[in-house]
């Protein structure tokens, strides 16, 4: 017919119409820079380079900067009392910095460190080991960043802390091991939250992260800051089945018992009192977060109670806004424990990472005391929190630099404490605002969907 062209003619016409775009090196350079800074796909390039850079940097630090003795000698003295002297009464185990106050997982790990470093004879071996521990933790946390689609400019922040490097390779604190197991736990939870079509794998991963979480707690109790969010996450992963969730809790308790068997058999009361002493007092002079107060107010039980109440209010607000149906789902599961319950509007892939990471940050904000090594508890989550808070590219790094200054300010002082409190409060408020706006949008979307379905039915 007239006006029609054959396919061959159309292809020929397309070839004739193609015009190669002009070469614009400046625009290409800008696009490349924009890609490397803002596009999460660039993390496949950025992350390996950062890990390589960190590996070399840690080597240089170990070689050029003198080891700083703070707690490692005390760890070794305590292990000697347990391993060489056969002391199993926790209340009698002590070192240069005081009594043993960590659970049996700490003892298990530092027995290995005692063998590696031969007590205090070869601390340099311990530094090398902690270098690998740092790099492993960094690689795992970057896996979390990749799954959560963080832009590269946020990822880079994970490698910029002077204080964190010293905590690992210059001081050999036990906090580093707890952080490793918590990163593994959160990574496992993120992966499990995406296993919508593989329920058996999801529940198996829930059991695995219960074990790794318990391992973290058995090294140092700061991992308990994750506990409320951990139970909610397991509840969601188990499709709101309270029995399966309780079985995961039993798995946590089982590890605590297994790792502490020698002490529980001999002196159970002393072990539980020393390893899980929630009333332990912290030294005011080394607490970097409340130096704007005097020592008397810092040690006041009313202040501790106010922090606890504020902590609980913040956690409750977090859970209710992120998972509004938590109470109805829990009640339904209690009424029908053997039935598979639908977790409505929970959105596991977003809810689980958010409640885990945000609840830990809330716990840090309302902690009675933060010593310098405690930075490792939450530093690895800062790139995620900054990204979630919606901070612009030019604001996030400024916040981070100020935050790092607070942790490097020595000795602890009121100016750094006040600024740290302000920075962390602002970050939490920004998280709350973005979360609230997201919840409102989700509720409106759900309402529109429900109304549309009702109209179709009518």
UniProtKB/Swiss-Prot annotation:
Signal peptide: none
Stretches that traverse the bilayer: 42-62, 96-116, 138-158, 172-192, 217-237, 243-263, 303-323, 346-366, 382-402, 416-436
Cellular location(s): Endoplasmic reticulum membrane
Top-level class of the enzyme under EC nomenclature: transferase
Reaction catalysed by this enzyme: an alpha-D-Man-(1->2)-alpha-D-Man-(1->2)-alpha-D-Man-(1->3)-[alpha-D-Man-(1->6)]-beta-D-Man-(1->4)-beta-D-GlcNAc-(1->4)-alpha-D-GlcNAc-diphospho-di-trans,poly-cis-dolichol + a di-trans,poly-cis-dolichyl beta-D-mannosyl phosphate = an alpha-D-Man-(1->2)-alpha-D-Man-(1->2)-alpha-D-Man-(1->3)-[alpha-D-Man-(1->3)-alpha-D-Man-(1->6)]-beta-D-Man-(1->4)-beta-D-GlcNAc-(1->4)-alpha-D-GlcNAc-diphospho-di-trans,poly-cis-dolichol + a di-trans,poly-cis-dolichyl phosphate + H(+)
GO aspect biological process, one term: protein glycosylation
Assigned GO CC terms: endoplasmic reticulum; endoplasmic reticulum membrane
Cytoplasmic compartment spans: 63-95, 159-171, 238-242, 324-345, 403-415
Membrane-topology annotation of the record: Multi-pass membrane protein
Key words, A-Z: Endoplasmic reticulum, Glycosyltransferase, Membrane, Transferase, Transmembrane, Transmembrane helix
Pathway membership, UniProt: Protein modification; protein glycosylation
UniProt similarity note: Belongs to the glycosyltransferase ALG3 family.
Functional description taken from the UniProt entry: Dol-P-Man:Man(5)GlcNAc(2)-PP-Dol alpha-1,3-mannosyltransferase that operates in the biosynthetic pathway of dolichol-linked oligosaccharides, the glycan precursors employed in protein asparagine (N)-glycosylation. The assembly of dolichol-linked oligosaccharides begins on the cytosolic side of the endoplasmic reticulum membrane and finishes in its lumen. The sequential addition of sugars to dolichol pyrophosphate produces dolichol-linked oligosaccharides containing fourteen sugars, including two GlcNAcs, nine mannoses and three glucoses.
Name the UniProt record assigns to this protein: Dol-P-Man:Man(5)GlcNAc(2)-PP-Dol alpha-1,3-mannosyltransferase
